Amino acid sequence: MTNQPTEIAIVGGGMVGGALALGLAQHGFAVTVIEHAEPAPFVADSQPDVRISAISAASVSLLKGLGVWDAVQAMRCHPYRRLETWEWETAHVVFDAAELKLPLLGYMVENTVLQQALWQALEAHPKVTLRVPGSLIALHRHDDLQELELKGGEVIRAKLVIGADGANSQVRQMAGIGVHAWQYAQSCMLISVQCENDPGDSTWQQFTPDGPRAFLPLFDNWASLVWYDSPARIRQLQNMNMAQLQAEIAKHFPSRLGYVTPLAAGAFPLTRRHALQYVQPGLALVGDAAHTIHPLAGQGVNLGYRDVDALIDVLVNARSYGEAWASYPVLKRYQMRRMADNFIMQSGMDLFYAGFSNNLPPLRFMRNLGLMAAERAGVLKRQALKYALGL
């Protein structure tokens, strides 16, 4: 059994954990990242990853600050400048970058592209140690240090352990941190399609009685479709071949989609989780390990990047003032900054989900009236967009 000391151990080196590790290393912390496997290498002429993230303007700024955005753009991403949502054709809400005098709202980025860009930067940084493949099997606290036991017998001792290991976080579970959680009565299917026409720079979402249908433009003539429906219906779609799925898309997506050819699909259930606490002495949770959200507005990874920004700021400031930066009072500052914001965003998505998953005629009328009012709200609409973009 080997015993390796480090300042900070991060379990999970994905989009959020990788960004956090890089940011902390750039501020001089010695960081060890524990990850099951390296991200898949980027292949330039491959079809897109089914998993797509809508990266907001604020998240792009964070990634630029970390020095990885050029690598993302050198692989591939696609800007979007307009976001539109509606149920009735007479009740559209349109958010446009021009309203905020911005060049764009954000970028559509494949998860594997973002992971690869971050991983390359982590491999090159002298303050980062990568443990891959690495699997956490036990976590204990001794003498103000966290001891992480890995499969194979290696023990890593760290002042601070950070769980960035996703919705089913082992760090959270091993720390005994509970969650508020429930399953939505919906599942989600992601479908990579080739479009007959240029997908453009607008992303849109139509609410239907069965669940939303969304369109995310990608590079070249590629796009991603998002189909929300009952778990039984999504299972039915999963069992179809691509020709059958193409026919279902034509029936159930709005005509503005045009002719598309599906080439890959994946599905997952929708669950809401919120950790009862984000921190303990020498321990913190970030991203999906702390909170998951209905993907309706594409805010999941952006909330994770807000966590990253806040935690880096708290730790760097505490160290600069000579404080015990891994102590509970310091880490509690991070929780105070992020927990309420994440709860507000979760609750907003829950309100949308509840409001648009009921088909009583009076409620349908009221919610479409609400969309019409939102479109005409002017300053309020712009403030809502700025909040969603993290500006």
UniProtKB/Swiss-Prot annotation:
EC number: 1.14.99.60
Pathway(s) per entry: Cofactor biosynthesis; ubiquinone biosynthesis
Main location: cytoplasm
Needed cofactors: FAD
GO terms of biological process kind: ubiquinone biosynthetic process
Catalyzed reactions per annotation: a 5-methoxy-2-methyl-3-(all-trans-polyprenyl)benzene-1,4-diol + AH2 + O2 = a 3-demethylubiquinol + A + H2O
UniProt keyword terms in alphabetical order: Cytoplasm, FAD, Flavoprotein, Monooxygenase, Oxidoreductase, Ubiquinone biosynthesis
UniProt enzyme class: oxidoreductase
Pfam families according to UniProt: FAD_binding_3
GO molecular function, one term: FAD binding
Subcellular location: Cytoplasm
GO cellular component: cytoplasm; ubiquinone biosynthesis complex
SUPFAM superfamilies: FAD/NAD(P)-binding domain
Subunit-level organization: Component of the Ubi complex metabolon, which regroups five ubiquinone biosynthesis proteins (UbiE, UbiF, UbiG, UbiH and UbiI) and two accessory factors (UbiK and the lipid-binding protein UbiJ).
Family: Belongs to the UbiH/COQ6 family.
Protein name from the UniProt record: 3-demethoxyubiquinol 3-hydroxylase
Species of provenance: Escherichia coli (strain K12)
Upper taxonomic lineage: Bacteria, Pseudomonadati, Pseudomonadota, Gammaproteobacteria, Enterobacterales
Encoding gene, per UniProt annotation: ubiF
